[in-house]
């Protein structure tokens, strides 16, 4: 799995890292409160400890992890961009927009 992070998204993520020193970024398929495990939303969690069995994703400079069991919900090639109008991240693949408004949640 490879994720390209645009310069605008890198800047947004770096601001989140700077505001939360020592926390690690984990790409999550968050199904909490959705009623069904397949009705989740992609989210980036910033936390002291990674949850579950994680592996580091290939990115262009931003350290990002994912639970091995959650890889099934994502594409092999993705891009994280920044949505200036909404002030959120956007997660997309060559085939589809996975999340036009992906949040960064501090845990």
Swiss-Prot record:
InterPro entries: FeS_biogenesis, HesB-like_dom_sf. Pfam families: Fe-S_biosyn (PF01521). This is Uncharacterized protein YqkB. It comes from Bacillus subtilis (strain 168). The lineage of its organism: Bacteria, Bacillati, Bacillota, Bacilli, Bacillales.
């Amino acid at each position: 799995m490879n994720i390209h992070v645009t310069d605008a998204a890198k800047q947004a993520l770096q601001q989140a890292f700077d505001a939360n020193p020592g926390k690690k970024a984990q790409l999550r398929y968050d199904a909490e409160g959705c009623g069904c495990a397949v009705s989740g939303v992609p989210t980036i969690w910033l936390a002291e400890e990674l949850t579950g069995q994680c592996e580091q994703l290939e990115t262009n400079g931003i350290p990002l992890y994912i639970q091995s069991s959650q890889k099934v919900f994502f594409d092999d090639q993705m891009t994280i961009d920044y949505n200036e109008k909404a002030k959120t991240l956007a997660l997309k693949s060559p085939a589809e927009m996975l999340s036009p408004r992906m949040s960064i949640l501090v845990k």
